[in-house]
Amino acid sequence: MSRLAILLAAVVAGCGRPRVSSVEWLAMGTVAKVSFKCGGCDASAQRNAGAIAREAYARVEDRLSVWNPKSEISNYTSVEAVSPDMRPCYEMAFDVQRKSGGAFNPFWRGNGKGPDLGGIAKGFAVDMAAKRLEAVGIGREGDVLLDLGGNLKAVSGVWRTGIRDPSGLGGIVQTLTLSNGMACATSGEYERGKHIRDGRTGIPVSNDVASVTVVHPSSATVADALSTVLFVLGRADGDDFLKRHYPDAFAVWVMRDANGRD
């Protein structure tokens, strides 16, 4: 459930460093960006990549928006009845729900309402866009990074990203390197206040975690879901959960002190 928590800080340094250019727009209620790093970036390839990602994000939003009464998820009956290309998102959400004991809970709204995949949908959309870009060969001639509201995936190449200070004071608390398929997502308070709820109680989370970033070797979907789970569980239980169920992922924690400061 990334909330603009991670931003691109810099590309990996080197002699004759390639130029970075981006295509940017609004999607799924946040900022979407496709960044390119190459010696002679082809403008038409960039536009094509932006169009492909835009189409992927629009499809996910059209199917998974709980705010649209006509969307597929608003009329959910069973996972077997959903569109085949959306089914992996449901299945992953339900799997994480089971493993986390409900800390991640697509049915947190209760009262017989259907699932809400907001805690995983943006990561899923990034993975869908990445697959479509790879299918047409975008990324072979240069490095490509997808960013959907802080859900990042390095489609190709090596990228450096910075975890923004969740206190709102600005600055970067730690840098990360993503390469060739790696993805990351962050959950924290940031601009939107207490938006993260414990799926077991429906109550906004209140603990000593300021933010947690999860890096996964291949899945933005998994990183998105796990960042929410770990924020809810807290550091001790979160680290244990990660080791038991997702040992190929790792977390970067930013904690509050006894006075509530980051």
Region spans (language model):
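Mature catalytic core of soluble alpha/beta enzymes
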Residues: 3-262
